[in-house]
């Protein structure tokens, strides 16, 4: 996605990757892996133990990520992967344990995400991923990421179960929706920040739908490869891709200088 027409340099190492094809590819792989691994753990061991493991992994991954002074591919994508696992568990727990319908949980998660964005913008006056170059901004960023995973999980389950679309049809639908912000940005000039976060949210149900389609039994409309097998395969793919990114540094952008949007006629600009 393109940059802003007006920017100002702000000192501080970028703590997130450049938004390229590699970003979206690995992001979708992590969403699929998070769905498969979460379901595998919850159905294989005690659900409370599984959630505990997911929560511990989430905390450890974020601690490692916040300890980094700049974007490092392995630590960043490890954090995203653990957010994918734990975020899935949180959304599933809301439905299974609290018996919250998928439609309502989607609305609740959307409200939570809106709240995160509102507070983030209130403090930082921007929601741009290009501005994530301080610990506080990164904290808001990860809060938003976790909320997008929870919301995306609920939306994906709603399409598959409540709307009775099934996994493959849901995956195809979300693939089309995922392309909308890119087309809207190129054709209609949709704002970069809105386009980015719209696409980011959709990656969750997109990846999860395909992961479920690959892993669930034939009786549920899947290919029956097994959730564990799918989780392992996706994890291997993520490790290989992230290793390439770490070695090539092809996704490191403007290290040491972050770009913030500037509107000369207004006090702030999203």
Where in this protein do the model-derived segments appear?
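Polytopic alpha-helical membrane proteins, predominantly small-molecule transporters/carriers
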Residues: 1-270
């Amino acid at each position: 996605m393109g940059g802003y027409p007006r920017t100002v340099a702000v000192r501080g190492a970028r703590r997130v990757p450049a938004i390229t094809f590699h970003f979206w590819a690995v992001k979708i792989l992590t969403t699929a892996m998070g769905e498969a691994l979460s379901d595998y753990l919850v159905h294989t061991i005690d659900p409370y133990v599984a959630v505990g493991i997911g929560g511990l992994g989430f905390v450890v991954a974020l601690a490692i990520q916040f300890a980094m002074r700049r974007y490092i591919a392995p630590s960043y994508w490890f954090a995203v992967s653990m957010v994918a696992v734990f975020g899935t568990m949180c959304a599933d727990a809301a439905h299974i344990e609290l018996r919250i319908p998928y439609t309502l949980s989607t609305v609740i998660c959307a409200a939570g995400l809106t709240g995160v964005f509102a507070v983030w913008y209130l403090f930082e006056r921007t929601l741009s991923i290009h501005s994530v170059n301080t610990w506080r901004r990164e904290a808001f960023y990860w809060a938003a990421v976790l909320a997008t995973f929870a919301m995306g999980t609920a939306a994906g389950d709603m399409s598959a179960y409540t709307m009775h679309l099934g996994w493959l049809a849901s995956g195809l639908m979300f693939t089309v929706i995922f392309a909308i912000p890119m087309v809207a940005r190129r054709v209609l000039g949709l704002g970069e920040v809105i386009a980015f976060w719209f696409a980011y949210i959709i990656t969750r149900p997109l990846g999860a739908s395909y992961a479920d389609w690959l892993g669930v039994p034939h009786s549920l409309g899947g290919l029956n490869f097994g959730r564990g097998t799918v989780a392992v395969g996706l994890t291997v793919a993520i490790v290989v891709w992230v290793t390439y990114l770490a070695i090539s540094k092809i996704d490191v952008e403007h290290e040491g200088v972050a770009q913030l949007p500037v509107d000369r006629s207004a006090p702030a600009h999203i």
